[in-house]
Amino acid sequence: MTVYSYLVILFILLDNYCSAYGYGYSYYHRRHFDPAIASFTKEPYIGAVWFTQHGDYMYVNGSVAGLPPGKLLGTHVHRYGGLGNMCLEAGPHFNPFNQRHGPRHGYPRHAGDLGNIRVGRGGVAKFDFYVTIKGLGPFDGFIGRALVIHANRDDLGRNRDEGSRTTGNSGPRLACATIGFRAP
């Protein structure tokens, strides 16, 4: 047998081992987020927010109009994509690892914690930030879930009460949109 033959056998065995323990293609696929978009189309909230992975970070950019001017508003990805009943069908924050609520760059935190956005004088909020995804472990991403904009500022889980640890005391849900695959 040649060295090449041994290498081929080694790679086949390694691939089978990795696949058996969840580190093959399926692991990579769960770690890589396909480009996504959340389109806000229900008046008065109009806009779009894009999600694009860059290594260990998710770039979030876009804008939503029709929000209360001059406020900081909590934003989160919620577990479900349902938008009914004033966004309550979106369920709780996306939290596959049962962590405390926190800031978008801190740990522990929910996978769906996006922090606060500032609404300008004209009622338009601009999204333009990176979210750390390194260390969150493999999960199936944001596709099919809802992006929710809340009525209050997110306290980022810094208070000692239960509301802070679960929702950041962000208040009622103002606007929501289902996150779907983005066209190339």
UniProtKB/Swiss-Prot annotation:
Protein EC: 1.15.1.1
Residues holding Cu cation: H76, H78, H93, H150
Major location category of this protein: secreted
Subunit architecture: Homodimer.
PANTHER family: SUPEROXIDE DISMUTASE CU-ZN -RELATED
Chain's role: Destroys radicals which are normally produced within the cells and which are toxic to biological systems.
Name the record gives this protein: Extracellular superoxide dismutase [Cu-Zn]
